[in-house]
Amino acid sequence: MSATSINPNNWHWTSKDCRVWSHEYFNKELPKIQASEGPTSARITQVNSCEGDVDVSMRKRKVITIFDLKIQMEFKGETKDGVEATGSITCPELSYDLGYSDYVFDIDIYSASKEKEPIKELVREKIIPQIRQLFSGFSQVLLQTHGDDVYLSTEEHNGNAARGLPVHSSFKQNNSSQTSSNKGTTTVAAGSGSDGSRVSAVVNTADISENYTFDAPANELYATFLDPARVAAWSRAPPQLDVRPQGAFSLFHGNVVGKFLVLEENKKIVQTWRLSSWPTGHYAEITFTFDQADSYTTLRMIMKGVPIGEEEVVQGNIQDYYIRPIKTVFGFGAVL
């Protein structure tokens, strides 16, 4: 592959984390909102919390925003009789795929009383529409402010790649030496790995498991793990997928590799799986089981053969680089 083909025409995925900037933006803009109705007035005083993910990304020459936030702010008001009130407004979901009328707001008056109701009503009628307007324009503000940062020229991207600089999220590796332990482990001696490759040394291993809930049908979630376009979206890197038994896969620019072992449509995926930092030739075996319920799907993950000391690293990677982005990109549930 020639140097100029690493990122032809901004074809691959680059991304910028804008969480800190977003918090600062709302801290600045929300307190500008105020309203009055006769002698009754109210205004936003501060932002209490702004939690979630905000990314500006570029894929196939298209710059997009992906965000999912929970925002809580405080307000203060006063009635014509001099009654003062403070309270909070919570938007549980400010997401890239919601519009002006889709946002939900919970209004809470501290030490509520009948005398304070006019302030709450003013907030509902005059303050909330202004917040909706601000939120509905957030995506465009993100693009205008940060779009140029992810739209790299071919020369810029190639220069970064040549220097080994990251242009997207990559899996965390645990490169520290580990102390062997046989407690609750299986020992894999030198010989063949689960994919048929050579294991160069004895590896003490453990098993890990976790369940995840998605607001999506099993067939959609199953496809999200196998369809190249979907995998590229949530992994933020071009995948290599040979989706068939014994077909190889490579994710996150080779940080995760393995082979498909079992593919039961909409029900189960079994793979060999390894991080590039693991002992040469050693593969774990990961099973994803898709359990469909009435309105959601439970994804059951079991990984056998994780090198001792890597358990937390692997669990964190599955959460941060599989589960969280799938929910965020496709709207398959709340991000915790």
From Swiss-Prot:
Classification via InterPro entries: Aha1, AHSA1-like_N, ASHA1/2-like_C, START-like_dom_sf
Bias (Low complexity) ranges: 169-187
GO MF: ATPase activator activity; protein-folding chaperone binding
SUPFAM superfamilies linked to this entry: Activator of Hsp90 ATPase, Aha1, Bet v1-like
Residue ranges, annotated region (Disordered): 162-195
One record GO biological process: protein folding
Highest taxon listed in the record's lineage: Eukaryota
GO cellular component terms, A-Z: cytosol
Recorded family membership: Belongs to the AHA1 family.
Protein name: Uncharacterized protein C1711.08
Organism the protein comes from: Schizosaccharomyces pombe (strain 972 / ATCC 24843) (Fission yeast)
